């Protein structure tokens, strides 16, 4: 009898771990992209208003990127040359707020920006991940626009939220 109960418990636990989750949708990807945009704008606003922009950036990295969920994250920011590929949360934070471990960083999020428009050209869904590629346009406080190209990969965390695990951004090639 005890053996039967133990087997049933183990079988139930194994099935709970391997049971498929709800598929990621285009709407899920759009929602996390909007949240990323809102967070980027919030970091800049806190900086401009004299608030704790570093805390907002840390909260953004913890909530939207996979670091706090135990995922490895590949981060290749738009405006980076000396340290183009970033493998740690500290290196990503340095890019956004500019006073970290990478001397070249000026604080991309401190511009500040007032809007980010995403234009996904394609999204690939595979199990508990989705990869989106396209162009996004950043509008700064003076109304100037900068277009960049991106590839973001999102992985579903244990709590069901999407986390950024690949962030690759670059400026368009000019002939």
Where are these regions (language model features)?
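Sec-dependent N-terminal signal peptides
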Residues: 4-13
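Short, low-complexity N-terminal intrinsically disordered segments enriched in polar/charged residues
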Residues: 17-67
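Conserved aromatic-histidine-acidic binding/catalytic patches
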Residues: 24, 28, 124, 142
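A broad structural signal for short, well-ordered beta-strand segments within beta-sheet-rich domains
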Residues: 28, 113-115, 164
